[in-house]
Amino acid sequence: MDNVIGLEIIEVVEQAAIASARWMGKGDKNMADQAAVDAMRNRMNQIHMRGRIVIGEGERDEAPMLYIGEEVGICTRPDAAQYCNPEELIEIDIAVDPCEGTNLCAYGQPGSMAVLAISEKGGLFAAPDFYMKKLAAPPAAKGKVDIRNSATENLKILSECLDRAIDELVVVVMKRDRHNDLIQEIRDAGARVQLISDGDVSAALACAFSGTNIHALMGIGAAPEGVISAAAMRALGGHFQGQLVYDPAVVMTKEWANRTREGNLEELKKAGITDPDKVYEAEELASGETVLFAACGITPGMLMKGVRFFKGGARTQSLVISTQSKTARFVDTIHMFDQQLKSLQLY
């Protein structure tokens, strides 16, 4: 699968990022998202595969979607027999977030990117549109820190694993009211906090690379993005755990103002989740034999530059990670829109 569609999924996120970047700074997050969705769907439908969206985006925000259950790829067309050999058919599950950090893109802030993860059919956890408590950490701390520990205890373990003083550690936390106690605990333990408004996939990724000055991600975010983060962290050998959150009193968000703990538990039960308190490891959220992750910066971020337009073209920076080839490739691409382009932007 890696050799067949690895390059093509890079183009999927590149096209989504370019389309969304045209709306960067214009204050309309829905248009930034819609442009990314349309571009991502269009490019995926040009790939020789039978793909199924298992993690879509937008339900909670009432935004445009690549909806859960949607089929994409040339081999899903009514005339697929003309193009696809059933014996060579690639069936894959796909998790997408065409514009992760829509507000970041809309207001020209760093950290927005187009992301997706793929695996063979059944290889990605079909997370419900709930919230998830998350813990991400570098490979050196894999299996040593634990989401069931207090933040203070995990910071002590992380300090030992990384051979750093606690006051040299930086923890990323989303700026939400529900995290006030967590933020205070991290600070009281002596570590530093980097607050972000959106985009915790990027923060989870940053934990796996030395030199980013990000050593952990803690807190509650969206469950679908948790699966995407887990796919990347599994491929990178980093630590990732997730635990679904179903209590509106814990989430503290207006989107769940009319929901109840009991109603959420019933919804999870209907979704086939019999243990709502289960702690999921990265290998359970992205369990496939082969897992691919791809991202392309829309605005400048921790790991990738954003889309840069120039006369007649654009330049993108992407990242593709594979469990099959055990690689993390940074891809710098010049896109030539104008056939009469007189020069290319080198940097």
From Swiss-Prot:
What is the native source organism of this protein? Thermosynechococcus vestitus (strain NIES-2133 / IAM M-273 / BP-1)
Keywords assigned by UniProt, alphabetized:
Calvin cycle, Carbohydrate metabolism, Hydrolase, Manganese, Metal-binding
What pathway annotation does it carry? Answer: Carbohydrate biosynthesis; Calvin cycle
Coiled-coil intervals: none
Q: Which residues bind Mn(2+) 1?
A: D33, E57
Record-annotated residues binding Mn(2+) 2? D97, E100, E225
Oligomer status and interactors = Homotetramer.
Q: What is this protein called?
A: D-fructose 1,6-bisphosphatase class 2/sedoheptulose 1,7-bisphosphatase
List membrane-spanning regions.
none
Q: Which GO terms describe its molecular function?
A: fructose 1,6-bisphosphate 1-phosphatase activity; metal ion binding; sedoheptulose-bisphosphatase activity
Which transformation does this protein catalyse, written as a reaction?
beta-D-fructose 1,6-bisphosphate + H2O = beta-D-fructose 6-phosphate + phosphate; D-sedoheptulose 1,7-bisphosphate + H2O = D-sedoheptulose 7-phosphate + phosphate
**EC number of this enzyme:** 3.1.3.11, 3.1.3.37
